[in-house]
Structures are given as C-alpha cells and as structure tokens.
C-alpha cells in the first residue's frame, strides 16, 4: 500500500545522493505517488529540484545522517552515492529502517575492497589480479607484485575520479597522488589491478525483484580520463560471453541480496568474462535506457525496491547516449542552442541535469538517440551533445 505524498499517509523515500541519477529515480518514485526527500552535501542538487523536500548534510557524518532519518522518518532509504556513513545505515537497518537494496550491499560496494573480496575470494569469480595498499610503501610493493601495466584506483571513488593506468615506474608518484586526490572520502587505500587484455567493457544492468532476476541487453561504453563519454545498447557479443556474463551477474546480485537494479561491470574478450565492479543502484552508462527501453534503469530500480513485479523489458533497438561535458567556472550556468541540437537528429532527446555550478570539468547533460546500428546511434548522440552551447 502506498500513501499520498505530503499527506499523513505518505510513503516517504529518502534519497542519499541527489545527482543526475538520483533525479531520475526521484521522478520515477513520484510516478507512484511516493514522497521524495532528497539529501546531498550541497544545495540545489539535481534531485532536490524535483523532490518534495531537500536537506543538505555531510552524509559521511553518522550523527548527522541519523538526525536526518529521525527527522524525516522515511519508509525506505535509497543510497545513490558511495560517500555515506554505511555503519550508521547498518545500525538504522537493525533498528527497523528499510535500506535498499540493503545496508550490507551498500557497505560492500561503497569501496572496491569489499566487493572485490566478495567476488574473487568468496564467490570465486574471475577477476583481474589485485593488491590493496594503504601507504606509499604498500603501493610500491603492490605495483611490483602486480607488474606493469596496472590500473590504480582509490577504493572509494566514482565517475572515474582518481583512476589511472600506470605503464611507467617514472609515473608511480603521480599515480599515487592522483588516486589520493580522487577518493570520495579523501586520502586512503587504493587498489592496484593487473591489466586485463579485454576487447571491450560492458555494463549488464541486472534487476533483482519480487518476480525474479531480470537482465537488460548489455551496454557498451567508451571511457576517457576514467569517465564514460558514450554508451550504447545492445553491445554485440557472443552467445557464450553473454551467458557467462549473466551467470556472473546473477551470482553477484544474489550474494548481495535485496531488491533493486544493479550495474554489473564486466570485461570481455571473445568468450571470456571477468568481473570488474558492481553498484547497487542505477549506473551512469545506463542513461541510454532512457531512450532504448520501455522501462529505463530508473523505472526498473523503483519498481524493484517498491516490491513491484518487472515483467518483460522491451528493447527498442540500437540506441546511444553521449554526455554533455564542459569545462568552466560558474554558479549560474546557462545553455543555448537546444533547439538546433534537437533539430539535428529526428527523434533525439536531451537531458540537462540542472547542476547548480561548475568548477573545472563537469558532466552537465546527456544526449540520446537511436539508429539502424549502434555506431550510427552513437554518432547521432555525439552530434546532439556537441551542439549544446554552455555559457559559464
């Protein structure tokens, strides 16, 4: 049973993290009349602009997080970012507050150490070789053990921040410093991964719901500077590789438990599959589903966490997303050329996230398009994104 938003009967959802992905989740929640309370570390975040209420706090502060939960009395807490006081979430869950998919999944996936140890050491899934390092000395030893080239990442970061490929020992200090600066919680532990000779990466959106486990078609994507620039669906792959990918994804989400959508990241080479990472929430590369499917990743996540059946997911054919990424400094961003951008491609769509400021490089929107093939859809989406003029 759902109540009516803002009324005594309201079913309340507290979003912890209010970026562009949280914004789409908030919109989907409101389609079911759910009252949405959006929280983040800065005011006027994208999801706050469409929520019923908004709160600003440091979500790594357990006392502040507990105080907010006491104030808003949510029926469910929906973590949308990694930088959250997960120990407090676990305590709240033990006290009867519903965390989706569950507090353990949030704890394990908020840092790469927890999920890598689950996947490789408990589930026995194929992964790249890895070592963790807390100090500069441990980092040097880890690089020596793994060998070059290797991938260096903070154990806690998002959108590629702090990630680098280390190919030359002369760049060792630079790689360590970059990882320390890119961590969501500041300086801390890093993971050093052996370089997997993969042909491509996919995101396999996997939904665990009341009516079982469901898979979206695989999503391919291109990364640059550790962040996604374009994604497309479906990614072409062999029947065996897809079957193995689904097997890996099902094992991971089954071990994490709870209902929701999970973004499972995998490396593929021929028929071989390696597990990379998983997020227990919508994935940035999955924004392509806003145009590629009848139920976007956000709609699927909301259905699952509300205990509703998924049924059949219908895919519309080759589709793509391309980010609107700009550099600048402004607290009053303006956009022009929207009409010209949309006129370029019949059926194209555009989402501007409404981010309140820019300081350096920031993802401000996403263009969406379909085509006869994925390559065509990507070029269309890139053309639309490039035509948007950002005035800082």
Swiss-Prot record:
Keyword terms of this UniProt record: ATP-binding, Ligase, Magnesium, Metal-binding, Nucleotide-binding, Purine biosynthesis
Pfam family for this entry, one: ATP-grasp
Residues annotated as binding ATP: 112, 153, 158-163, 193-196, 201
Gene Ontology cellular component terms for the protein in this record: cytosol
UniProt-recorded Gene Ontology molecular function terms: ATP binding; magnesium ion binding; phosphoribosylglycinamide formyltransferase 2 activity; phosphoribosylglycinamide formyltransferase activity
Entry's Gene Ontology BP terms: 'de novo' IMP biosynthetic process
Subunit structure: Homodimer.
Family: Belongs to the PurK/PurT family.
Protein's UniProt name: Formate-dependent phosphoribosylglycinamide formyltransferase
Source organism: Aeromonas salmonicida (strain A449)
């Amino acid at each position: 049973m759902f109540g009516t938003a803002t009324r005594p009967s309201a079913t309340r959802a507290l979003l912890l993290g209010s970026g562009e992905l949280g914004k789409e989740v908030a919109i989907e929640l409101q389609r079911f009349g759910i009252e949405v309370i959006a929280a983040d570390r800065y005011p006027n975040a994208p999801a706050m602009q469409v929520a019923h209420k908004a709160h600003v706090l440091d979500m790594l502060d357990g006392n502040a997080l507990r105080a907010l939960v006491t104030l808003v009395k949510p029926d469910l807490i929906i973590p949308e970012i990694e930088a959250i006081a997960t120990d407090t979430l676990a305590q709240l869950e033990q006290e009867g507050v519903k965390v989706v998919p569950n507090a353990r999944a949030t704890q394990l996936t908020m840092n790469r150490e927890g999920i890598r140890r689950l996947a490789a050491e408990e589930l026995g899934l194929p992964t790249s070789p890895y070592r963790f390092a807390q100090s500069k000395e441990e980092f040097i030893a880890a690089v020596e053990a793994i060998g070059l080239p290797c991938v260096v990442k903070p154990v806690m970061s998002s959108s590629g921040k702090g990630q680098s490929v280390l190919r030359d020992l002369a760049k060792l200090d630079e790689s360590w410093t970059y990882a320390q600066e890119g961590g969501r919680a500041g300086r801390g532990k890093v993971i050093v991964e052996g370089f997997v000779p993969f042909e491509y990466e996919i995101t396999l959106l996997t939904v665990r719901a009341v009516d079982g486990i469901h898979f979206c078609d695989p999503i391919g994507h291109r990364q640059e500077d550790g962040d996604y620039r374009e994604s497309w669906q479906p990614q072409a792959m062999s029947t065996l590789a897809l079957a193995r990918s689904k097997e890996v994804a099902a094992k991971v989400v089954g071990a994490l438990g709870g209902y929701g959508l999970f973004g499972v990241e995998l490396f593929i080479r021929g028929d071989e599959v390696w597990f990379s990472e998983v997020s227990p929430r919508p994935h940035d590369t999955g924004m392509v589903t806003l145009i590629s499917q009848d139920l976007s990743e956000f709609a699927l996540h909301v259905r699952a966490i509300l205990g509703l059946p998924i049924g059949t997911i219908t895919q519309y054919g080759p589709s793509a997303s391309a980010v609107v990424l700009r550099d600048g400094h402004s607290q009053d961003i303006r956009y022009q050329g929207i009409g010209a951008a949309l006129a370029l491609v019949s059926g194209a769509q555009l989402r501007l996230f409404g981010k309140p400021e820019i300081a350096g490089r920031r993802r401000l929107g996403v263009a969406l398009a379909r085509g006869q093939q994925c390559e065509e859809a990507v070029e269309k989406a890139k053309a639309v994104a490039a035509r948007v003029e950002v005035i800082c």
